[in-house]
C-alpha cells in the first residue's frame, strides 16, 4: 500500500536521497541518465537509442552522450542489432542493476524518515 506524499515530503525525500548519493561512493548520474537506466531496467527489452530518444523526447546524440558516460561506468552496454545493423541495442549490466538496487534501498530508507 502506498501513502501519498505532499509536495514538501516528496521534495524532502528527493533531497535526502540525493544527499545520500552525493555522500556515498555512487556514480554521479544526471536525472537524464537515471531515467535512461530506469527505463532499461523497468521496461521490457529490446531498447534502442532511437526508442530511448523518442521516449525522453531528446535527440539521438543526447542519448548517445549519456550512454557513453554510463558505459564507461559499466552501468549499461551496447551492441549492434544482428537483425537490423542500423540499430544499436542498449543492454543491462550487473553493475547497473546493483546501482538501481542501492538507489531503491536509499529511497526506502529515507522514506521512513518522512
Predicted features, each with a name:
Residues 17-21, 101-114:
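Amphipathic alpha-helical dimerization/coiled-coil segments
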